[in-house]
């Protein structure tokens, strides 16, 4: 196998280079006597790129890592599509790709062609400098090289009054885990839940919150800019180059009030969000620049030059942005906005056993109990050790009421769960009770219950009659059946 692959790569124009003969100062092992790399020069319209292939233990199922040893001088420090950290060439999305793992020759010939194509496309993207660059579609944030993480519990917008906190937790190893989390003022309960579920100390919220600015960026170009920025001056230079309106808004927001700590949240059109944490040296800026008379004409360029000064930004960090708002959490189960969102439905789940236990978790992931309307779980049985093998609950819940234990488990699963209640009794099959729900799910597996529910539901007029869903296993689990009864 090694000989076949060796000759294939040589035939593609690679030369085998022992590790000890590789250039010094690169991020590859250059000391091992047993290692070596396959190196090739690729010519593009922008110049020559030198690529080293790093082969893995099983080249059949793992494509090689492409390391950039050398690139044209004019591209150094600039954003090139598919090139990250200045040395990593992303020529394929390996976890999504498909190839004939039993044909090494064809596979590695394709790898060679794909590297050439990727480099050509990357160079063409830089030269064209368009804003709707297909080579960077949805990937712009991947080149940000974030230093810490910011989680958003609310959708970012110019109208959203976001406040951020830096939270910390000490791990069992003694190391400290840190993250920034931003939420609206009305999300205080969700924020506390978030901290508790992620094992952070609530005392972090006692610190003064960090002013968070949401800034829309509509760039006139993406590729080819100096990237990533390492200070506030470089951020402002980037904005001035690609979107002067966003540049002016950023400067205005930073100069508007005397605040030391800021998070700039950039909503880049067609891309994921980017964020920056910074601390301003207010003494350097000077009092005369704050609270300026609105009637006086301001000079954005002068203020930007001041903010970009060497001693103005005392601390600067690039933050990776992760959305954790309600819509994002539930989006996988809502391919269409008008279908699948259960957060607006009043739901009763009757039976919290084998079917009901797992069903409750799936309902939560479709929004049940995550809005203003309630999600009620009914069961008068307790969770016992013999239930463990077929239930979603754990040994921690032995002896507890199934409905209450399951409801608590759901509420602890995610911070947006807010209207979930476990009721430790049988569901009262009465017309006035049924009318309080939009959906009633029968997971008891008992035909008498199903028949009675269907009969009583039909005594209600259509406007207040819930949809009945009967779910049960048949033949000791050989088949699962679901019957949806809308009363017609």
Description of each model-found segment:
Residues 23-92:
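Compact alpha/beta protein-protein interaction domains typified by the UBC
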Residues 73-135:
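Glycine-centered motif in EGF-like
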Residues 134, 139-345:
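Glycine/serine-rich phosphate-binding loop and adjoining beta1-alpha1 elements at the start
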Residues 263, 376-378, 423, 439-441, ...:
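Hydrophobic/aromatic beta-strand patches that form the interior of the parallel beta-sheet core
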Residues 338-384:
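Glycine-rich adenosine-cofactor-binding loop
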Residues 374-415:
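Glycine-rich phosphate-binding loop and adjoining beta1-alpha1-beta2 segment
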Residues 406-438, 444-449:
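A structured beta-alpha segment of the ubiquitous adenosine-cofactor-binding alpha/beta core
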Residues 439-484:
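ADP-ribose/adenylate-binding Rossmann-like module
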């Amino acid at each position: 196998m090694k000989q076949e692959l060796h000759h294939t790569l040589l035939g593609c124009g690679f030369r085998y280079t022992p590790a000890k003969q590789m250039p010094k100062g690169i991020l590859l092992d250059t000391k091992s006597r047993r290692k070596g790399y396959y190196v090739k020069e690729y010519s593009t319209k922008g110049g020559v790129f030198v690529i080293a292939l790093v082969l893995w233990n099983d080249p059949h199922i793992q494509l090689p890592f492409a390391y950039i040893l050398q690139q044209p001088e004019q591209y150094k420090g600039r954003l090139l599509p598919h090139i990250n950290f200045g040395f990593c060439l992303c020529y394929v999305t390996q976890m999504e790709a498909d190839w004939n793992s039993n044909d090494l020759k064809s596979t590695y010939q394709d790898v060679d062609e794909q590297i050439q194509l990727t480099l050509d496309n990357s160079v063409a993207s830089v030269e064209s400098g368009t804003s709707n660059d297909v080579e960077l579609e949805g990937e712009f944030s991947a080149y940000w090289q974030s230093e810490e993480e910011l989680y958003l519990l609310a959708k970012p917008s110019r109208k959203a009054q976001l406040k951020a906190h830096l939270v910390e937790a000490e791990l069992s190893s003694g190391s400290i885990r840190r993250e920034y989390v931003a939420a609206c003022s009305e999300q205080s309960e969700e924020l506390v839940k978030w901290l508790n579920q992620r094992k952070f100390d609530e005392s972090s919220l006692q610190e003064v919150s960090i002013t968070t600015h949401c800034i829309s960026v509509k760039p006139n170009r993406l590729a080819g800019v100096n990237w990533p920025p390492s200070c506030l001056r470089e951020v402002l230079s980037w904005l001035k180059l690609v979107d002067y309106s966003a540049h002016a808004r950023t400067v205005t927001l930073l100069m508007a009030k005397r605040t030391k700590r800021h998070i700039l949240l950039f909503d880049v059109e067609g891309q994921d969000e980017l964020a920056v944490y910074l601390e301003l040296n207010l003494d350097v800026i000077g009092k005369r620049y704050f609270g300026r008379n609105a009637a006086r004409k301001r000079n954005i360029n002068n203020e930007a030059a001041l903010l970009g000064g060497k001693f103005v930004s005392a601390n600067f960090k690039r933050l990776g942005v992760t959305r954790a708002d309600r819509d994002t959490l539930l989006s996988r189960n809502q391919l269409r906005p008008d279908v699948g969102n259960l957060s607006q439905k009043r739901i009763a789940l009757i039976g919290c056993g084998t079917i009901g236990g797992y069903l409750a978790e799936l309902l939560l992931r479709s929004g049940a109990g995550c809005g203003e309307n309630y999600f009620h779980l009914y069961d008068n049985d307790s969770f016992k050790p013999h239930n463990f093998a077929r239930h979603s609950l754990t040994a921690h819940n032995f002896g507890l009421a199934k409905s209450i234990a399951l409801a608590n488990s759901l509420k602890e699963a995610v911070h947006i769960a807010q209207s979930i209640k476990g009721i430790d009794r049988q569901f009262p099959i009465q017309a006035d009770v049924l009318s309080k729900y939009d959906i009633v799910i029968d997971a008891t597996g008992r035909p008498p219950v199903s028949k009675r529910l269907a009969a009583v539901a039909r005594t209600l007029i259509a406007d207040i009659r819930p949809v009945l869903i009967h779910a049960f296993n048949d033949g000791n689990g050989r088949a699962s059946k679901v019957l949806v009864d809308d009363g017609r």
